[in-house]
């Protein structure tokens, strides 16, 4: 598999349950249905992506970790949720 880069991941990505924007400066905006939002940062470690955020209206710091298993094309990646050990798809939008 080709190496995942920060430049490739920067942008807006859609998951079936949430969407996010990853900036080149490691800022993160994450959104869920019902207009729930979170703000934080993201980090690339090898092929592993670590999202750290605080949901609006809360003080709890949350983490979501996934690995990029395959770059299908420039707009689609297969990921593996580190906690659930489940393959999922992220699409650029």
Regions found by a protein language model. Give the residues of each.
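N-terminal cationic leader/targeting segments used for protein routing and processing
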Residues: 4-7, 44, 48, 76, ...
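N-terminal glycine/threonine-rich, aromatic-flanked beta-hairpin/loop signature
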Residues: 14-50, 54-61
């Amino acid at each position: 598999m080709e190496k995942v880069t920060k430049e490739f991941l920067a942008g807006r990505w859609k998951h079936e349950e949430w969407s996010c924007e990853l900036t080149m400066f490691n800022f993160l905006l994450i959104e869920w249905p019902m207009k729930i939002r979170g703000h934080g940062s993201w980090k690339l470690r090898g092929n592993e992506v670590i999202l750290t955020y605080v949901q609006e209206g809360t003080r709890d710091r949350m983490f979501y970790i996934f690995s990029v298993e395959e770059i299908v094309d420039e707009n689609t990646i297969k990921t593996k949720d580190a906690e659930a050990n489940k393959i999922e798809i992220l699409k650029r939008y």
